[in-house]
Swiss-Prot record:
Protein name: Alpha-1,3-galactosidase A
The keyword Repeat is assigned to this record: yes
Entry's family note: Belongs to the glycosyl hydrolase 110 family. A subfamily.
GO molecular function: alpha-galactosidase activity
Chain positions of PbH1 repeats: 351-373, 482-504, 515-537, 547-569
Length: 596
């Protein structure tokens, strides 16, 4: 059962913002469709005064569609062009006759300025909790919905910073054959084309907006700007790795012509080579690419994400999610080398099945896949059967992390070992970071300062297969869940850090999850950061095993240094039938595997 107060607060937050209320009416102000209708939107030739029932009488904007509650068999055909209004969809189809939103081939540009805004509280992203976030497409309390386009031909483009698709309390939703991109990426980039003496010449990708003044370069786009510098990476396309460095503070930048710059070093010599790309971003996590919240049965099929801002596809308290044939990579033949600020696919507090198959992930500044729960610290015990808990990480808070009926584990902050369980019977949100939980049974008597709880009802099984992970300076997959995990037949290419990392902590990111059943089988690891597979929970004073029952079998490791597997505080480990090479020569397992 969902927390009704928290859900209402979330809905109200999603309705706040400067967007015109008439374009985004509430459910009670909408008209119920009888079903089996076809409507058309044509931003170039339409008129919102038209009936919208044929291409020749199409609406101009999404506003008339936003005044409907759609029903089984309804189809909304959206023709390409510039969309000034978000699509805010409510309705319910059936499994046999879903509501279909068909984006016709071409460029669908969602303009900056009048899009629907809200204040969703997003895990690992909440640097700006009170700033309205724009949304191009919003699905709310929608069921049996199909979003579709033509693969390789239908592109949804954002002019300014926004969430592409935000869905909350939705069910049976599929996204098929769609491409997603930014007109003006929030990641500043340039490609070095020439180095001579103390000067580099570089080309800035099309669509990347910038100004040069007084020897400095500023990246900008609709509603945002930042001066070059701060967090950055240098990507070497020839090797597919991140290497090198660049400090713009020691340079003078001049514009030679539109998209062409020179960079002269005031001291020292150029630190980049021709063919290398500089990637530069603001570190403020104020938005994400896609947000899926309290929704279930979500399918992504044959989609391509060319660029998204901030954290990537965030699934928060969702159930049963599948990504099939998803590609996250820059547009072919583009000079861009980055597709995502942070994680590609981020799962926080989900349950059911997470399936990722036949995908290409990467081109990000953080992990390809991250699956975790959240540890909340116990800060008070106001009654024998009550506890007050607090979100501890500054980028994760504000959402309803518990509901009546959820099972919780009490976890030692020092050992990370669960020592008691209970069931939630009531939830009271005290403020954006603190929650009072009423429990069915009294608290255990051995709670220690800084101990935490985890919502173990919301823990998913994970199956990742036939997926390529590349062009990432950090990790490939972070996986912490007690339900079964299977990673098989995947290919990891030159991740900067471990290709697969299993942690669990109650002092840093507070990302929770003991592992109870994990198999890593028949994967290929090429020149990844080491240890390539690292299973090391962050237990300050370990006592016993945090994780257990892990099998690593039949994998192939091409090593840079020699450490393929490092495991700590984990029981029932099997590492067998794996192949290890370094510099083309086989090395024995005892040298490549470190289990203690």
């Amino acid at each position: 059962m969902q927390n009704p107060v928290a859900s209402l607060l979330f809905i109200l937050a999603m309705l706040t913002g400067p967007c015109p209320a008439a374009d985004y009416p509430e459910r009670t102000e909408r008209t119920q469709s009888a079903g089996n209708h076809v409507w058309h939107i044509d931003p170039d030739k339409g008129n919102d005064g038209n009936p919208g029932t044929a291409p020749s009488t199409a609406w101009k904007s999404m506003a008339p569609a936003n005044r409907l509650i759609m029903a089984r068999g309804d189809t909304l055909v959206i023709h390409p062009g510039e969309h000034a209004v978000s699509l805010a969809l409510m309705g319910e189809g059936s499994k046999q006759a879903p509501v279909t939103i068909r984006f016709m081939p071409g460029r669908h540009i969602f303009k900056h300025g009048a899009l629907m805004t809200g204040k969703p509280q997003i895990s690992n992203t909440n640097d700006a909790p009170n700033e309205p976030k724009a949304m191009a497409i919003r699905l709310m309390e929608a069921k049996n919905i199909r979003l579709e386009g033509k693969p390789g031909a239908t592109d949804i483009l954002l002019e300014g910073k926004a969430i592409f698709v935000c869905m909350e309390h939705a069910e049976n939703v599929s996204l098929n054959g769609l491409g997603f991109d930014y007109l003006h990426p929030t990641m500043g980039e340039f490609l070095v084309t020439e180095v001579e003496g103390d000067t580099m010449k570089a080309t800035i990708p099309d669509g990347t907006l910038y100004t040069v003044k007084d020897g400095n370069l500023t990246w900008h786009g609709p509603g945002w700007e930042f001066r070059m510098g701060g967090y950055s990476k240098v990507f070497d396309s020839a090797s597919g790795t991140f290497q090198g460095r660049f400090d713009p503070g020691k340079t003078v930048i001049r514009e030679l012509s539109p998209g062409k710059i020179s960079i002269t070093f005031k001291e020292g010599s150029p630190t980049m080579k021709p063919g290398q790309s500089y990637q530069n971003r603001n570190t403020r996590r104020d938005c994400c690419g896609f947000f899926q919240y309290r929704s279930k049965n979500i399918l992504w099929n044959n989609c391509h994400i060319y660029y998204m801002h901030g954290m990537g596809v965030v699934s928060q308290f969702c159930e049963n999610i599948m990504f099939s044939h998803l590609k996250i990579a820059p547009r072919p033949r583009s000079l861009r080398t980055n597709s995502s600020w942070a994680d590609n696919l981020h799962f926080s507090g989900c349950r059911g099945k997470i399936i990722v198959k036949d995908c290409v992930l990467g081109a990000s500044h953080d992990d390809a896949v991250n699956v975790h729960g959240t540890h909340l610290r116990i800060i008070d015990r106001p009654a024998p059967n009550k506890i007050t808990v607090r979100f501890m990480h500054p980028q994760t808070f504000g959402f309803d992390a518990f509901a009546a009926g959820d099972r919780i584990d009490y976890v030692s902050c020092n050992t990370l070992v669960p020592y008691a369980s209970n069931t939630v019977s009531g939830v009271k949100q005290l403020n954006e970071k603190e929650i009072e939980l009423t429990l069915q049974h009294p608290n255990p008597g051995n709670i220690q300062p800084d101990d935490v709880v985890e919502n173990v009802t919301w823990t998913p099984s994970v199956h990742i297969s036939n997926t390529v992970c590349r062009h990432i300076p950090t990790r490939g997959f972070l996986l912490t869940t007690r339900k079964p995990v299977l990673v098989e037949r995947c290919r990891f290419e030159k991740t900067g850090m471990p290709a697969i990392l299993v942690e669990d902590d109650a002092s840093g990111w507070y990302e929770s999850g003991v592992v109870r059943n994990m198999t890593i089988s028949r994967n290929t690891f090429i020149q990844c950061g080491e240890a390539v597979i690292q299973i090391v929970p962050h237990a300050p004073r370990p006592e016993g095993d945090v994780h257990r029952n892990i099998t690593i079998t039949g994998n192939t490791f091409d090593l840079k240094n020699g450490t393929a597997i490092r495991i700590r505080h984990t029981g029932d480990v099997k590492a067998e039938k794996n192949t290890f090479t370094k510099d083309g020569k086989k090395i024995p397992e005892e040298k490549a595997v470190d289990i203690r």
